[in-house]
Amino acid sequence: MHQNIRNIAIIAHVDHGKTTLLDQLLQQSGTFQKHEEKKERIMDSNDLEKERGITILSKNTSIKWKEYKINIVDTPGHADFGGEVERVMSMVDSVLLIVDALDGPMPQTRFVTKKAFKYGLNPIVVINKIDRKNSRPDWVINEIFDLFVNLNANDKQLDFPIIYTSAILGTSGINYLDMKENMIPLYEAIIKYAPAPNVDPNQKFQMQISQLDYNNYLGVIGVGRIKQGHIKPNDSVVIIDSLGNTRNGKINKVLNYFGLKRLEIQKGDAGDIIAITGLNKLNISDTICHPDNLCPLPPLIIDEPTVNMFFSVNTSPFSGKEGKYITSRQILERLKKETIHNVALQVKETKDANIFSVSGRGELHLSILIENMRREGFELEVSRPKIIFREINDIKQEPFENIILDIEEKHQGNIMKFIGERKGELKNITVDPNKRIRLEYLLSSRALIGFRTEFMSITSGTGLFYSSFSHYQKYQKNDIGQRKNGVLISNSTGMAVAFALFNLQERGKLFLGHGTQVYEGQIIGLHNRSNDLTVNCLTGKKLTNMRASGTDEAIILTTFTKFTLEEALSFINDDELVEITPKSIRLRKRYLKENERKKANRDRTTIVD
């Protein structure tokens, strides 16, 4: 039975067509019936994934083609979700590497491919978007070969099969000049080159939990690949955690994937990827085995977090007006629940019961969590993201990242100046036929906080930016990543009025418009100078009973800046917070009253002296 199973992971950079290709594989294999609704981007189930066009959680699907069953696991492309990638590799026997026929391999591709090689998996390379204007498949294949050599691939991994596809047109072929009007060449390549799982169906049952899900009806759902034996509903099992502790349990239901549905089955066989219910308090990496076969599998290793933030209860004067969940207990419960399946996330309580330290793989990793909490109705405050330093042989070290910037030629000077200020080290420059320039840099992770926002503004939204973790090296003492300008701070609570805002415009750039409710200590704009300025944005025009002589100035407000969550996080300094509610994102000073801020500054200066 297990000879007809193929378990493969899909690796692709953001926007190289991974999800669209999966849609075609599902539809052309007949996994979807004619009457079923066919949506685009089927695999991206989370609202944020659909909006941003990125995959955050790894997901499973299964395709029946002829007598074969192909289990496909979708992996996130971002290094920020590396915790997801690690677990996927432990479930599969081969990887499908999807690369854009024009762009070639990118840093995120490199990150996941490196993990795949670490697990000894052989790639099947899919050159997608072959229908793109100016596509250059031969150049892309050379780039992929160079990438594999840099990643220390073995001879078998370097001798990779290549399939050309256009996911949007539903065509594929082994020669890009002779494409078939279907996906059959790709199905055949998967069956031929992906090995059947190396499992033993005759031994006693054993599997490792690689993913967790939760359902209100079924409770905790553990997902993994059966390493040996088989499993049926109501079987008694033993759970062994990563520390070697054991406890008994009983399987309730055994579920299998078909298309995007999870269906109940009467027996799960060796080599297949299944889901089980009935076992509470499961953790990633737990081994589930037969009571007569207490043999734990090696625990999965997850990359350490690189970024830390503080989440706290909303203490602003507007607390509780817009959200449902506002207490420290509710926030902590939600964060603890997130750590069950989001294993790269670490949550610690601090001395203050209202503040929690949250560490993750990157700015994006944490901002996705905050955005999800916000949509669920939470109110909270968060601090500026900080890089986690390491002490190695008593030397303070910080993480560095490889970044690739794809920009138009006219922006090159400004971008190089901008990265020079952030102490970036230029590694390579290439110019492509479309007069776009690709710059490769080595840059401290500290310098990357707030980088994306500034980069997009310099390139007028036309630039592409990718980063992946490189290594730790000696900490360089400098103030990169800190904002140079001060801010405009409201001196009282009330409604901002156009007359006051009009007079403040010459002082800086405003973050709100007429009629917005503000409170004392809220940041309402960016000052033109380097110091903070406390201002009054509530004063209306003084009215008299004298008739106006027609000399009144027309009050015209310039468009104010509205922050997204990521922009707000990267904008604030260490003495500021972002207040997040389901309806608003506000910036504020940590100390709302001006005399408290002055006292805190004096104390800080005394400590430095």
From Swiss-Prot:
Against PANTHER family, the record matches this protein to: TR-TYPE G DOMAIN-CONTAINING PROTEIN, TRANSLATION ELONGATION FACTOR-RELATED
Record's subunit section:
Monomer.
Keywords, comma-separated and alphabetical = Cytoplasm, GTP-binding, Hydrolase, Nucleotide-binding, Ribosome biogenesis, RNA-binding, rRNA-binding, tRNA-binding
Cytoplasm found in the keyword field = yes
Species, as recorded: Buchnera aphidicola subsp. Schizaphis graminum (strain Sg)
One GO location term (cellular component):
ribonucleoprotein complex
UniProt-annotated location(s): Cytoplasm
Keyword check for Heme = no
What is catalysed by this protein?
GTP + H2O = GDP + phosphate + H(+)
Which protein is depicted? Large ribosomal subunit assembly factor BipA
Q: Which Pfam families match?
A: BipA_C, EFG_C, GTP_EFTU, GTP_EFTU_D2
Name the principal localization, coarsely classed.
cytoplasm
Q: Which family does it belong to?
A: Belongs to the TRAFAC class translation factor GTPase superfamily. Classic translation factor GTPase family. BipA subfamily.
EC class of the enzyme, as a word: hydrolase
PROSITE patterns registered for this protein in UniProt: G_TR_1, G_TR_2
Its biological purpose is as follows: A 50S ribosomal subunit assembly protein with GTPase activity, required for 50S subunit assembly at low temperatures, may also play a role in translation. Binds GTP and analogs. Binds the 70S ribosome between the 30S and 50S subunits, in a similar position as ribosome-bound EF-G; it contacts a number of ribosomal proteins, both rRNAs and the A-site tRNA.
Which GO BP terms, alphabetically? ribosomal large subunit assembly
Positions with a binding annotation for GTP: D15, H16, G17, K18, T19, T20, N128, K129, I130, D131
